[in-house]
Every structure is written in C-alpha cells, then in structure tokens.
Amino acid sequence: MAVHRGSARAAPASDKVQKNKPAQTSGLEQGSRMARIFGFEWADLSSWQSVVTLLNRPTDPANLAVFRFLFAFLMLLDIPQERGLSSLDRKYLDGLDVCRFPLLDALRPLPLDWMYLVYTIMFLGALGMMLGLWYRLSCMLFLLPYWYVFLLDKTSWNNHSYLYGLLAFQLTFMDANHYWSVDGLLSAQKKNAHVPLWNYTVLRGQIFIVYFIAGVKKLDADWVEGYSMEHLSRHWLFSPFKLVLSEELTSLLVVHWCGLLLDLSAGFLLFFDASRPIGLVFVSYFHCMNSQLFSIGMFPYVMLASSPLFCSAEWPRKLVARCPKRLQELLPAKAAPRPSASCVYKRARAKAGQKPGLRHHLGTVFTLLYLLEQLFLPYSHFLTQGYNNWTNGLYGYSWDMMVHSRSHQHVKITYRDGLTGELGYLNPGVFTQSRRWKDHADMLKQYATCLSLLLPKYNVTEPQIYFDIWVSINDRFQQRLFDPRVDIVQAVWSPFRRTPWVQPLLMDLSPWRTKLQDIKSSLDNHTEVVFIADFPGLHLENFVSEDLGNTSIQLLQGEVTVELVAEQKNQTLREGEKMQLPAGEYHKVYTVSSSPSCYMYIYVNTTEVALEQDLAYLQELKEKVENGSETGPLPPELQPLLEGEVKGGPEPTPLVQTFLRRQRKLQEIERRRNSPLHERFLRFVLRKLYVFRRSFLMTRISLRNLLFGRPSLEQLAQEVTYANLRPFEPVDESSASNTDSSDPHPSEPDSEHVHSEL
C-alpha cells in the first residue's frame, strides 16, 4: 500500500533487458515483476535506510496539488453547511440555557461574535489552502479552528467529519503547494518542485483504511443478514434492480452484500494498475448514489476527489498537454518537475549521491506511525470502555458506517427533588439542541449533570435525574438502554472503565427478528405493532391515547403482570396470552419471570381510520360531481370542495378544511415531482444561495460588532431580519418554509401514541 507504481521511477530490470539476457536469475525476474505491480523492489525494504530512501523518492507534485485544491474547495462549501456557519447564531446564541456535549468538559464555546471570528479564520484557512497561498499557515488556520469546533460538540460527530480533520492534518505536513499554487509564483524553490513519495503514501493509505475497515466492520452479522439498512432499497435509485429482484433481495444482495464487497475491495481495486479503471467506475457510482441516499454533506465528493490520488502522479500534466496551446498558458505547467530538498535523489540525479537527512527520517517515521495508529484506533475500544454501549467506542472514528440503525420508541426523564422527594417529568431533549445524547452513556452523564445545575433555577433542590430510554437497534425488540433506577447525576462514569448502568443488548433475542417480520406482514394496513423486551424486576408505565380505540398486549415470551391503574386491576399473562387495554388510561407492565419478557402492543388508530374514511368519501363525492354522475346540489358547507375557500363565503367544516389542506399538499408534491430538471436544479441552487448569503451577512454583522461595538437592539434586529430574507426564491416557496433549511437540527418527530411520555 505504501507505494504506487505510477509514482515510481522505472524499474531497473525491464522486460527488454530480460529478453536480451535469458540467463538472468529468477530473483531478478521476481523483483522486476514486483516493481511492476507494487512500484518497489524487495531491496527497497531491506533496511531502514532503504525504506527512508523509498518513501522520500522524488515524485511529481501535480496529482497532490489537484487533491489539495479540490479538498480545500469542498471545505469552503462545507463550512457554511455541515459545519453550521449559516445557523451559528441559533446554536451558540449568548445567554441560552443549553446543555452542551464537548469531548472535554473544560471546552466551552466562545461568545457568539467570537465564534463567528473562529469560523472566519477557518474559512480563510481553507481558501489559502485551496490557492496554495502561505500554504503551511493556511493549513494551520483551517486545522485548529476545525478541530476546536469538532471537539466542541460530540453530538455532531460522524465518520466523514473526522476524516476531513485527518486529511487537513496530513496536508499540513505535506508539500502540496509545489504545483498549481500562489506560493509557487512567489518562490522559485517551490514552483513545480518534486514532493517526497510519502506525501502520496499517507493519503492513499488513509483512503485505503477508510474503505477496508468499513468493509471489515460490515462483516457484522446484522449487515450480512440484511438488517442494518433494511428499508434503503425503497429508494428510487434501486428501481432498476427491482425490475429483476424483489425488494427484500434488493436489500440483501445489492445494498448489503454489494456494499460489503465494494468496501472490502475498493482499496485494492484502486491500488493496482490493472484493476484501477473498474475500481474508479465502481467507487464513483457508489459515491454518486450515496450523495442522493444520505444527507452526508461533502463526503461523497471528498471521496470522489480522493480517487485520482491512486492514479499516476503526473496525470494532470498529461491532461494539460492535451489541451489547446492557448488554454495551456492559463493552466499549470506541463514541464517536468524540478529537484527539491524534501526528496532523496540517487546517484543518477546527484553526482555524489545523497544521504537522507533528519527531515527525511522524520517524514518516514510520521508515515509509519500515522498509518499504524489509524489501523489501531478502530479497534481501541478496550481502552476507552466508558464510551462503549451496544456499539463500541465514540461514534465517528471506527469507520462502522451505516452498520447500526436505531429507532427510539419511548424516552422519559424523571427528576426527584433531593429535599422534598417531589417527582416531576421533563420533556425529552429539554435544554438541548440535539438528539444523539439518547444513545451514549457519556453524553447522558453530561446531560444529567447539566440538568442538575439548571433545575435549581426552577425551585428543584438537589435534583436526581433518571432516564428511561427504549431503543431498537437493527430491527430488534425495543428495550431499555440504561437502567431507569439509577440517578445519573450521582452515577459513576469513566472513559476507561465499563459503565455499569448500561443495560446489555439482548442478543439472545436476535433470532426473533424473522418472526417479528412475519407478524408485521400478517397485519392489515391500519394495524400497527410495537415489540417490547424488558428485564426481570423492571416495569413499563404506559399511556394509551384515546385515539387508539383498539389496543391489546400479547405476550411472546416470559411472564408479565399488567396493572390497569385506574381500575386497580392486575392480570398475569403467560406465553401466547393477550388482553385488551382501555384507551385514555395508564397501565403498567411488570416483568415477573426470571428471564427477559417479550411482548407486543397491537393497536389501531381508530380516529385516523375514521378520518381516512371521511376524506375518501369527500374525494369520491368531488369526483362524482366533476364527472357528472352526481347531479344533486352540494350543501353549502361542502361547496369549497369544488370552489375552494372563498372569502366571505360559508365557513368550511373542519373536515373539509382538512381535505382542502391535504389536496393542496398533494398537488404541490405532484407539481414538484413532475417539475422539469432545470426547475429542480434552480430550487437547489436557490437553497444553497440562501445558506451562503446568510452565512456572509451574519459573519459581517459579528465582525463589525467586534471591531466597532454592538449597535442598538433595533438595528441588530433589522440586520438579522434582512439576513433571514430569501430574496432569490419565489414568494410561495419562501413563505411556505416554516423551518430554515440550513438548520442542522430539525425538530424530532413525535413518538408513537402507544408510548407517549407520562
């Protein structure tokens, strides 16, 4: 992996030499074959000196410079979007009572205006990196604010954000400004000069690790059996596959198995010359699909930009050489690169030869240690056991992408006054701007500590905080993630020790998933089901909404006692037994068996069913009137079905209003779906334009505040209102936008009625 043939000098033993000298030894033949395949000989690995010489071999800087430019350009696009510059004032507004989740509790956000300055420095650093202007300084200006913002909020961590920081860190130590850079125009030593081979080795090794470790992680049984991304095959991108395969087989064979094979093989396909063309086709198709399937920002495009790194280092020169001569004057140089002090040259290049210096040894050490560290970190969870829950480690550096999908059915936060013993309940997520705290013990501890500091403002003394969080991972039963009996404020947590109040994942119940799918498929369209598993000695307190007029509970395994709170009745259920639950009342389900219990709620939203029937009747009536089969006049309250709501006319009934709202929504969806490609592209551009416009205007306001002081509140309010305008969008679209598309934390959908909070 360390070396690529396209970046190496020609092997000393060529095919021509072998033909002229058939008596050559087999060792030389093997060596030349190895050089053709890997780009180096065994002799290059025979000693430390040879390895240093190999990794500092002079290499064309063109390919590296193209990646530098593309990566930095994508970071310029990323900063207002996924880094959150466009919504920075919503996240870090001064004076907010907000619980935050930094990696280290000592990390705190700066005042809002200073946070805008941090983002401005990061943006200027990315711009300088892209242009190759004051390159090393620009890399630092981007890198330090990036990692500060990254470590400030664990809830926004993901694998690709981590990868961006790693790539920026690597580029900081490289000579990526030796081609196609402003620094090259200002310094003859840097202009079109060689770079050491290790610059490519580190980047190629990083991308190889991302692919390969992601594939190894997908060897997990849940992925291989098709449970991780079970519903992804419903996306329109997989429609061609569903012409010959069922949706279930498309999910298993195309989404899961092909995804596994691609990740395992992508690095190898890109590395070898013979397989690289097919590798480029596969990974390009893969990342283009990902850009449509997931909201993952610039990640697909960064990976697309990294693919040419595996090609020969001089490919940009060959491309420039094929351009018209007039255009070549505006493009980077096509001449051969010059010698550089960063590289080690052999006697053929330097008369007296060259011995590696300290910088060459340091570059080699950095390469080897960095790649070893990247291979170790995804499996270092035995050291950071405090971050292990049902999945291992801090999410974001393990490359276990898309392996685990979660659904949260029920979240309840209970507080107890430490002096009076009074109980109360909090809305899940109160004082937070994220939802990821539900899945991680470290964040839950930070959240409980923060709540214990905020609740005294609301006359709660020495608060104790308890969490009851129910999660399903990869279509298993809904079960508790944390022990609801433990006061998390006083609970022990350490990053290096196992968290005792994390409940184990009930892996023994995994085979039930096939049965659960059969049960779901046997129900009609109006019937819903929720599968629950609970531990012995615990109970679930639940409320059945009045809308759920037909709700029952059925035991699948173990033994439970159901208490109807209002009726003060208890009923014990054994395997296969079921009972009806009254709507509009609380009940408790106690697990009394010695092993975990498994049961399911089966319910019908009778209110919704009745509404659907009424709306279907109105739709049928409207169609009959329009086609002439209904000749009688409509009553006044139903006239809006044909004419719409008329000012001054009779007030439509609530049912008719609901029908009209649905019709308008369906018409808008249909209009957007059938809109021409250029119209969709225009909407996309306008949304992005708003994000960048707001980012620029809010940054300008904050920098003005730092330089000249804050103006009056009235002026600030006017400036922010102007920044929030959408002057480029049609009036109907901009007014219909109830939420800002740049907000990275949209509101969480309501939980199912059957598991609403107390």
Swiss-Prot record:
The chain crosses the membrane at residues 61-81, 114-134, 137-157, 293-313, 362-382. PANTHER family: VITAMIN K-DEPENDENT GAMMA-CARBOXYLASE (PTHR12639:SF6). Pfam families: HTTM (PF05090), VKGC_lumenal_dom (PF22777). The gene is Ggcx. Residues 1-29, 727-758 are annotated as: Disordered. It catalyses: 4-carboxy-L-glutamyl-[protein] + 2,3-epoxyphylloquinone + H2O + H(+) = phylloquinol + L-glutamyl-[protein] + CO2 + O2. It is a multi-pass membrane protein. One of its GO terms (biological process) is response to Thyroglobulin triiodothyronine. It comes from Rattus norvegicus (Rat). Residues 82-113, 158-292, 383-758 are lumenal. Mediates the vitamin K-dependent carboxylation of glutamate residues to calcium-binding gamma-carboxyglutamate (Gla) residues with the concomitant conversion of the reduced hydroquinone form of vitamin K to vitamin K epoxide. Catalyzes gamma-carboxylation of various proteins, such as blood coagulation factors (F2, F7, F9 and F10), osteocalcin (BGLAP) or matrix Gla protein (MGP). This is Vitamin K-dependent gamma-carboxylase. The lineage of its organism: Eukaryota, Metazoa, Chordata, Craniata, Vertebrata.
